[in-house]
């Protein structure tokens, strides 16, 4: 009887007029939205009120009661979500509109804008813009400022240009006035001449920035002496110089489909420092003695400065084919042949030692985009890691193990790659999960390096991809540390990389530390602590840019095959309430299968994201790691997602 009482409604509204709430705006595809106060409480924002705000805005809203329902009226903007963004031009009847290209706000179109960019705008032009005025703060309207033109719609390089702009990453390798570069370090007298040794390089056939060369020989006592020689850019690049500042800002060489954007000017990375064949080059070298069981005799490890001359630039494919007795390629001479065979022997005994005493990363399939000269996608191929890849990788891991030990012993600091295995909370979850499969570990055991290695070896023998997936989910992320810490995933007490100083600034830092020890520098300072968050942030941006460029290229590739009704094998990699995320085995493209295409009767379906399992009528039908058969339904132009359906 009180439900529609006018006096009661009036009283409630009086109370609600004073009720203000702060939260974050969440939009929906249907126009209305919600104000999220915390993870448990949200308030409804009708479509008309959503026109004053943008998804992600932090606002203060007034709560009113309408039809006995709590409604938010946005009142004060605390912080706008949209600041600088990527957008595209829409041109209708000679009127310019700008559409934001951002998740959740793709439907937001601005028609008020200003710009200092002089251009006759075309439909589909990509731009960088920033929010100038906000409807909730400035005169009830939105407006933007177009800062920069990125690319035309039909430019074949648009995917690269747009995504690199989105993450504020460079589109070209750095350029400098190369004439000023001199040998500033005066270390010529401290370098040992090893140009007479038969060093070789093994890389991709088109690689120009060659940063490692290898030489190995057998000793009288049936041991192997491996010398890993690494290009030495710090011979020419002093700390806090212009080129060093460039490298410090870029942090990594950015490897993208079709081309690379180098960390250093190419005059350094592909010429002056590159270990090209038959050219004398300065290097930082590590001599590693390996016994016949594959163990590194750490006390006999030696770091030193040297001159080398590579006797041959070999490709991964040719070396692998020759070792597997495939194809027609032959080493140029007996000396190179001997080096390949000895390196292969080194790989086998070192790999065997690490399997027994540390951990080996599983082989992951990689995919390569084959592009035409006009940047069209010709094909996508599966790239498996070859024997030659593994030879070089094993050599670099050995050198990095030695560097970690050397820096720990001499300085007690450096840039260390570390991984802590599990935190306490997830260790307990992992233990409880493993019990279901009769795999028993204590908390104390699983949180030690030896216990973690024991677990991983047991799982490798078990060869259950689902269990591996669940355990992987419980694991911590890798870290960078200034002090020596264990690397659980490698099964090593400490690990520090230094073998790619022309591609990674962190390796250049460790280079300088090792060189400082070699030349007897008295005062050696630890790396600046600010470099670690910079490396992590830059790595994240590069990884996200690569992911989104590849998504765009997959979109282009499959957009041409819209009518393709082929069946594809796909690996389930994630399960959420909304559906299945999977990866096509043939090309590596990520697909999404909405819940409606998994099973027609929704109430019979249970998608457990935590367990990574799909139940139908309470029976397990699909789980993460399963291989399923799918067909592609549609390609979403807005978010570049590929939608697929299950084929039973």
UniProtKB/Swiss-Prot annotation:
Q: Into which EC class is this enzyme placed?
A: hydrolase
Its Enzyme Commission number?
3.1.13.1
Q: What range(s) does the S1 motif domain occupy?
A: 565-647
What does the UniProt entry say about where the protein is found?
A: Cytoplasm
Keywords (A to Z) from UniProt: Cytoplasm, Exonuclease, Hydrolase, Nuclease, RNA-binding
Q: Which GO terms describe its molecular function?
A: exoribonuclease II activity; RNA binding
- The segment(s) forming the RNB domain are 191-518
Keyword Nuclease attached: yes
Q: Which reaction does it catalyse?
A: Exonucleolytic cleavage in the 3'- to 5'-direction to yield nucleoside 5'-phosphates
Q: Which SMART domains match?
A: CSP, RNB
Q: Which Pfam families match?
A: OB_RNB (PF08206), RNB (PF00773)
Instruction: Spell out the GO cellular component terms annotated for this protein, sorted alphabetically and separated by semicolons.
Output: cytosol
Predominant cellular place of this UniProt entry's protein: cytoplasm
Query: What's an example Gene Ontology biological process for this entry?
Result: mRNA catabolic process
Q: By its UniProt entry, which HAMAP family does this protein fall under? A: RNase_II (MF_01036)
Q: What family is this?
A: Belongs to the RNR ribonuclease family. RNase II subfamily.
Q: What does this protein do?
A: Involved in mRNA degradation. Hydrolyzes single-stranded polyribonucleotides processively in the 3' to 5' direction.
What name does the UniProt record give this protein?
Exoribonuclease 2
Lineage of the source organism? Bacteria, Pseudomonadati, Pseudomonadota, Gammaproteobacteria, Enterobacterales
């Amino acid at each position: 009887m009180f439900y529609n009482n006018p006096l009661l409604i009036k009283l409630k509204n009086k109370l609600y007029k004073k009720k203000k709430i702060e939260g974050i705006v969440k939009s929906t595809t249907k126009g209305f939205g919600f104000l999220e106060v915390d993870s448990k409480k949200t308030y409804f924002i009708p479509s008309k009120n959503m026109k004053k705000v943008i998804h992600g805005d932090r606002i203060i809203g007034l709560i009113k009661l309408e039809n006995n329902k709590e409604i938010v009226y946005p009142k004060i903007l605390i912080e706008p979500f949209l600041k600088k963004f990527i957008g595209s031009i829409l041109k209708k009847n000679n009127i310019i509109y700008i559409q934001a290209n951002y998740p959740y706000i793709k439907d937001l179109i601005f028609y008020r804008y200003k710009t200092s960019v002089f251009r006759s705008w075309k439909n589909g032009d990509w731009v960088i813009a920033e929010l100038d005025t906000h409807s909730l703060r400035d005169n009830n309207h939105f407006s933007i400022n177009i800062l920069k033109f990125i690319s035309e719609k039909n430019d074949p390089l648009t995917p690269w240009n747009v995504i690199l702009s989105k993450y504020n990453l460079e589109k070209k390798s750095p350029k400098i006035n190369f004439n000023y570069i001199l040998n500033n370090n005066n270390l010529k007298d401290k370098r040992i001449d090893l140009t007479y040794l038969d060093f070789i390089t093994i890389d991709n056939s088109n690689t120009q920035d060659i940063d490692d060369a290898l030489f190995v020989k057998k000793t009288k006592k049936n041991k192997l002496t491996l010398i890993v020689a690494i290009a030495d850019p710090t011979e020419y690049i002093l700390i806090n110089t212009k080129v060093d500042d460039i490298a410090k800002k870029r942090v990594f060489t950015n490897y993208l489909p079709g081309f690379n954007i180098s960390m250093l000017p190419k005059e350094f990375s592909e010429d002056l420092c590159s270990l090209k064949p038959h050219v004398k080059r300065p290097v930082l070298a590590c001599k590693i003695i390996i016994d016949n069981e594959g163990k590194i005799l750490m006390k006999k490890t030696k770091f030193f400065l040297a001159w080398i001359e590579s006797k041959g630039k070999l490709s991964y494919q040719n070396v692998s084919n020759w070792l597997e007795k495939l194809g027609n390629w032959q080493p140029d001479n007996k000396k190179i042949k001997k080096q390949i065979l000895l390196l292969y022997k080194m790989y086998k005994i070192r790999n065997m030692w690490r399997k027994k005493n540390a951990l080996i990363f599983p082989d992951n399939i990689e995919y390569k985009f084959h592009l035409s000269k006009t940047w069209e996608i010709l094909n996508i191929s599966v790239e498996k890691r070859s024997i030659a890849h593994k030879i070089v990788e094993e050599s670099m891991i050995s050198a990095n193990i030695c560097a970690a030990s050397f820096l720990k012993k001499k300085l007690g600091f450096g840039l260390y790659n570390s991984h802590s295995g599990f935190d306490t909370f997830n260790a307990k979850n992992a233990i409880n999960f493993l019990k279901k499969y009769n795999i028993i570990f204590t908390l104390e055991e699983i949180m030690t390096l030896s216990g973690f290695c024991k677990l991983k070896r047991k799982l490798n023998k078990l060869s259950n991809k689902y269990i591996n997936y669940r355990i992987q989910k419980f694991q911590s992320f890798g870290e960078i540390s200034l002090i020596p810490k264990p690397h659980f995933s490698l099964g090593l007490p400490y690990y520090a990389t230094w073998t790619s100083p022309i591609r990674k600034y962190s390796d250049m830092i460790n280079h300088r530390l090792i060189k400082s020890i070699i030349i007897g520098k008295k005062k050696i300072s630890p790396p600046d602590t600010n470099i670690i968050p910079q490396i992590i942030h830059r790595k994240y941006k590069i990884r996200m840019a690569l992911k989104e460029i590849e998504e765009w290229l997959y979109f282009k590739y499959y957009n041409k095959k819209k009518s393709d009704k082929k069946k594809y094998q796909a690996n389930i990699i994630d399960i959420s309430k909304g559906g299945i995320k999977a990866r096509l085995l043939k090309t590596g493209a990520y697909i999404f299968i909405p819940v409606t295409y998994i099973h027609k009767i929704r109430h019979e379906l249970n998608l457990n994201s935590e367990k990574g399992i799909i139940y139908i009528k309470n029976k397990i039908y699909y789980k993460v790691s399963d291989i399923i058969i799918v067909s592609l339904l549609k390609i979403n132009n807005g978010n570049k997602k590929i939608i697929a359906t299950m084929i039973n």
